[in-house]
Structures are given as structure tokens and as C-alpha cells.
Amino acid sequence: RVVRTARKLDEISYDEMLELASSGSKVMQSRSVEFAKKYAVTFEVRSSFNHNPGTLVKEEVSYMEKVVVRGVAADKDQTKVIVSNIADKPGSAAKVFRALAGANVNVDMIVQNAASQGVANLTFTVPQADAGRVARVLKPVLAEIGGGQVAVHDRIAKLSVVGVGMKTHSGVAATLFQALADAGINIDLISTSEIKISVVVDLDRADEAVRAAHAAFALDKA
């Protein structure tokens, strides 16, 4: 629906499917893939509208590290939280995130910036469903560590590119960042793992960002 030239994958690894599922792809639930991986169950994801062959999800795939990026996903149900002017000392961040964990708030991308005069800023993302509770949960924590402010920004989306080939190929981040720059899309936050790069962009540019990344990695090519 977002990229008209998107094509079906014949196969994909458990790890890639897990990353896509947790990054906004609405194909599979993460827990289902985790269960299949745990018991080494190969399964097929098919369309409910036709009888065409689907995508096999399994441990090892034939392309493995030859193909750098296998998929692009956008999660539009994210909120950015900025906790500013907290004491820049050991334990401050731990107390903030311990409180959020105790309230079952799932934190994703995290950036800490040291500001001047002994204070720091924490920026992270949470699901929109949890955003309303963040300020309430952190109020007593901020009082304990000497103050701070909480600001919530909900007009964001998390764009992710996923592929096991990232393990052995350089330049993936540069390609993604250049594609977004060429489209005039600003990057807010950046997070990386072994097989995934995620960035936060403006919600209104999310679909455009998906198309730019899709084209940059030639995902419409067989």
C-alpha cells in the first residue's frame, strides 16, 4: 500500500522476521516468530485473499549474507519522550529507566546528551499507548534525583531497514541516510543493531521515507 513496486519475498530468516515484526511490519506478531524459532519450526506466511505461494520463514535462507537489506518497515505508533535537565551523575538514567520498567513501559531507542552545568538530557521512544503514563511515572523519580522536565512528542515514526547481510557489508547506514537526505527528510534519532538500522522521522514524512529507503536498496528488484 505504501510502495506499489514492493514484491513478495520467497524466504526470510527468523531474525529478520522478528526485527520487521517489532519495527512496525503488520505481517506477523513477534511472539509467534519467537515460538517458531525456539522450536525450529519452518512456516509459511500466505495471503488470505488467494492461493499463491507465500514466504517461508526459517533458520537459514539461501541468500543469507549476499543480500544486504531484505525489508523496510515503519512504526507510526511511537512517541518520543525528552527528559531534560536531569543530574548528570551515575545512577540518574538507571533510576529513570528502572521506574519505566516497573510500570511496564516498553522503551526503545535511547539517546543521552550531556548538557552544560552538570545536567543531561535523555531522549527515548515508547509506544503511543504508554506515552500518557510516562510523566506520571517519572514525577517522583525526577524529584528524587534533583529535578528535570518531561516533554512528549507524538508526531513521529520509526523507520527500520532489516537484513542479515548488514553483518558483513559496510555502507548501509550511509545509503539510508543519503536516501533520506535526497528526499529532504530529517533524521531525529538513530539506533542500530547487528541486522537493523532504525531512525526516527516526522510522522507526515513516514510513507515517503519508506519509499526512499525501498528505492535506495533496490527492494523492488528480483
List each model region and its residues.
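C-terminal catalytic "cap/lid" subdomain
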Residues: 1-222
